[in-house]
């Protein structure tokens, strides 16, 4: 059984999928609470999702740009002294380990024009609070540099990082 989401990969839309043998899918359709107590996707969302798959088959330019943006941002944040959880996702967790600090940092970054979300328990395990940065292929190098600079400035102000200004 393989499941996945279409939410982030397809531009923040909705929906997901499950693949398995026909018998398993039939059982899930009869017994799966999320399936039974949810609604079908709007036709416009289904159409947009199908179009994205069509575009991805033709060209990897957007995916390649997203990968470059993600790697560039992570490198800049690590060099600045932030604790980043490694992974292949364009959602980059900047670990702060303190719930209040994650909220304070998110608020300070918003004042600098950088919109991020502070996550803490019960969304993530206790003492694993973080800032969630969601990158996009639409971000330019200038956007990423602005975000990294804002993180560094706020990181110094909140004594999160100790590197030279």
Residue ranges and their predicted role:
Residues 111-114, 123-165:
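PLP-dependent enzyme catalytic core of the Aspartate aminotransferase-like
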Residues 36-41, 81, 118-123:
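Short beta-strand/turn micro-motifs at beta-sheet edges
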Residues 1, 17, 114-116:
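Structural motif
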Residues 19, 93-95, 134-136:
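Short hydrophobic/aromatic beta-strand micro-patches
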